[in-house]
Each structure stands twice: as structure tokens, then as C-alpha cells.
Amino acid sequence: MAVLLDELEWSREQPLALPDPADRRLGRICQALLEDPADPRGLEEWARCVGASSRTLARLFLSELGVTFVHWRHQVRLAAALPRLAAGEAVARIAVDLGYQTPSAFSAMFRRLTGSTPSRYFALSDSA
């Protein structure tokens, strides 16, 4: 149990990695998602918007940002959610605002990225 708590503490201390891409097409996508994390467009739609193939964009996300498009979008949404959760906003409201179909889908993403549910993450922070 102590090892698990240490892992959770370490993950809370790590900054979210949202590097800026050099490629202008990726830059347009990343900026749009930072401005509106709930934007539902997938890689195919973004490819049409920026004049590239979805395969090219997928390769660029991996080579320039080190993560897939989906993972990067989850990180953006997590970064948008954390201050709101810390302020005590309801998980259901945040989930809807960030484009998740259900609060449980948001909680599942949160758990994958942080190792904890939203409510437990902040409860552990407060008790540490």
C-alpha cells in the first residue's frame, strides 16, 4: 500500500506534458484544442482542416510530441479539469464541459492518466 501511495504522490507532482509542436499544422490543432478542449473532431477531421493526411498527423504527434493525438487531447482535458476539480466543481459538470459523454468516461480517463479517481486524487492531496 505504501508503494501505491508513493506512486500516486509522484504522479501528482509531475507536470502535465503539453509541449508545443514545431509543425504549423500540429500547432493549429493543438491551439484549437487548448482553446476548446471539448472539440470533438478526430484526427480525420483535423487532417481535412489543416491539409494533411491523418497518417501524417499521427506520425507528427508521435515524433514531435511523443504521444498519440488521443493521448495529447486527454492531457489537454486533464489540464483543463484539474483547477476546476480543485475548486470543488462537480465531476459531472466538468465531464460534460470537456466533451465526455458521461462522468464515468471522464473518470476513467482521469484514472488512466493519474492513477486515481478525481475525488480520491484530491482527497489524497489534502491528506498529504
Report each predicted region and the residues it spans.
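Short hydrophobic/aromatic patch on the recognition helix
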Residues: 57, 61, 105-106, 110
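Regulatory input/activation interfaces that engage signals or partners
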Residues: 114
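Terminal helix-turn-helix DNA-binding modules in bacterial transcription factors
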Residues: 40, 44, 63-103, 123-128
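Short, basic interhelical loop/turn and adjoining N-cap
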Residues: 49-56, 99-105
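Short Gly/charged-rich anion-binding patches and loops
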Residues: 28, 56, 90
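Short, Lys/Arg-enriched, Trp-marked, Pro/Gly-tolerant hinge/linker segments that flank
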Residues: 1-50, 63-71, 75
